[in-house]
Amino acid sequence: MNTQLNNLILPIYMDYQATTPLDPRVMEAMLPYFTTKFGNPHSRSHSFGWEAENAVEEARGDIAKLIGAEAKEIIFTSGATESNNLAIKGIAKFYGNKKNHIITVVSEHKCVLDACRHLEQEGVKVTYLPIKPNGIIDLEVLKNAITDQTMLVSVMAVNNEIGVIQPLKEIGKICREKGVFFHSDIAQGFGKVPIDVNECNIDLASISGHKIYGPKGIGALYVRKKPRVRITPLINGGGQERGMRSGTLPTPLIVGLGTAANIAYNEMEKDTKHVNHLFDKFLDAINSQISEVYLNGDKDQRYKGNLNLSFAGVEGESIILAIKDLAVSSGSACTSASLEPSYVLRSMGVDEELAHTSIRFGIGRFTTEQEIDYAVKLICSKINKLRDLSPLWEMMQEGIDLKKIKWATH
């Protein structure tokens, strides 16, 4: 339930990696396609269909423009999870009789890892690359992992939990030289950081609508035409979307995604400046008032709308309860129901105790200075209170190594 405090609406939304609010301009663009412009974009015999088809094609062009692609290379899906599945399984099924090896990274989104595990059960060999303590892959390890059987490398652009940006250009160069397809889940980076599919030699890229102030239930997959990339569809039917994804297209949602992409294209610089300023303000204020706070992931090679912080000596779940006026997460929204420490943090080598204390704060287009000020004040007072109550924090301050303690069992 929302409450108001000095013009602040509580709780304050700081979970922009899980989803983003719909930009009012996106809502406005979508509305006519729910009401008067309701035609099926595949109906070729009357103006209702033509009108819807024109809207779909305009959106396709706006999405392509944002990543330096051609409109025909954009295939509409229900979201990034479907796009990731279509890219990975689609390549494996189409090229599987020639090659049988895929490379991905231990810190990928769960849907990429699960799609790969599914293929492993079908006999595909999968290599899961480790990440360095800063969250970024080692390019030499990638190079050495590629064999003559490798058909696909899948590495995300921006990590959903820690916000680090992987070196896409360098990865793309390696893949192109070795004749391997390169897929990237760009859902967290699309419209937020500059990504050019040609500069980065990306062959397939997964996009989500609700991560860029667009609607939920819509996404896209970029599939390169030159040199041509072939995939086997997951869904068969009327042959829409160049035969790669059958089904009637949801015109209102597509218009929403196209509008969101167009806004991002025009306002990325402004959004980046805003987010970077609030990131620096938030982090500097927290660090100046609380000790032993750790930023997870590389400080520079990252999207600054994502701050994953570990607060030594307090449990992440108790922090979330203490700061309930802030809508935050202790990891990916897809796995935050589990109390296991984040697999992304563990794969970076973050100590299990510290991984349990991590909170992901999201900053976005609609975050205000006033909200950041309130958040900092609340976090600092609650962390200090929780640490005062924590015998573990007291022991840490006395220099006791918690790992060496033998706890009695009752």
UniProtKB/Swiss-Prot annotation:
Q: Where does the chain bind pyridoxal 5'-phosphate?
A: 80-81, 160, 188, 208-210, 248
Q: Tell me the InterPro entries matching this sequence.
A: Aminotrans_V_dom (IPR000192), Aminotrans_V_PyrdxlP_BS (IPR020578), Cys_deSase_IscS (IPR010240), Cysteine_dSase (IPR016454), PyrdxlP-dep_Trfase (IPR015424), PyrdxlP-dep_Trfase_major (IPR015421), PyrdxlP-dep_Trfase_small (IPR015422)
Record has Aminoacyl-tRNA synthetase as a keyword: no
Active site, per annotation? 334
Q: Which cofactor does it need?
A: pyridoxal 5'-phosphate
> Which biological process annotations from GO are given for this protein?
[2Fe-2S] cluster assembly
Its GO CC terms are: L-cysteine desulfurase complex
Give the domain of life.
Bacteria
What keywords is this UniProt entry annotated with?
A: 2Fe-2S, Cytoplasm, Iron, Iron-sulfur, Metal-binding, Pyridoxal phosphate, Transferase
**Which leading EC class covers this enzyme?**
transferase
**Record: residues binding [2Fe-2S] cluster:** 334
Give compartment(s).
Answer: Cytoplasm
One family from Pfam that matches here is Aminotran_5
The PTM N6-(pyridoxal phosphate)lysine maps to: 211
The reaction(s) this protein catalyses: (sulfur carrier)-H + L-cysteine = (sulfur carrier)-SH + L-alanine
Q: Which GO terms describe its molecular function?
A: 2 iron, 2 sulfur cluster binding; cysteine desulfurase activity; metal ion binding; pyridoxal phosphate binding
Q: What EC number(s) does the entry state?
A: 2.8.1.7
- Associated pathway: Cofactor biosynthesis; iron-sulfur cluster biosynthesis
List the HAMAP family hit by this protein, alphabetically. Cys_desulf_IscS
Q: Which NCBIfam families match?
A: IscS (TIGR02006), PRK02948.1 (NF002806), PRK14012.1 (NF010611)
- Give the family this protein belongs to, as stated in its UniProt record: Belongs to the class-V pyridoxal-phosphate-dependent aminotransferase family. NifS/IscS subfamily.
Function (record text): Master enzyme that delivers sulfur to a number of partners involved in Fe-S cluster assembly, tRNA modification or cofactor biosynthesis. Catalyzes the removal of elemental sulfur atoms from cysteine to produce alanine. Functions as a sulfur delivery protein for Fe-S cluster synthesis onto IscU, an Fe-S scaffold assembly protein, as well as other S acceptor proteins.
According to the record's subunit comment, the protein's assembly and interactions are: Homodimer. Forms a heterotetramer with IscU, interacts with other sulfur acceptors.
What protein name applies here?
Answer: Cysteine desulfurase IscS
Q: Which organism is it from?
A: Rickettsia bellii (strain OSU 85-389)
Gene this protein is translated from: iscS
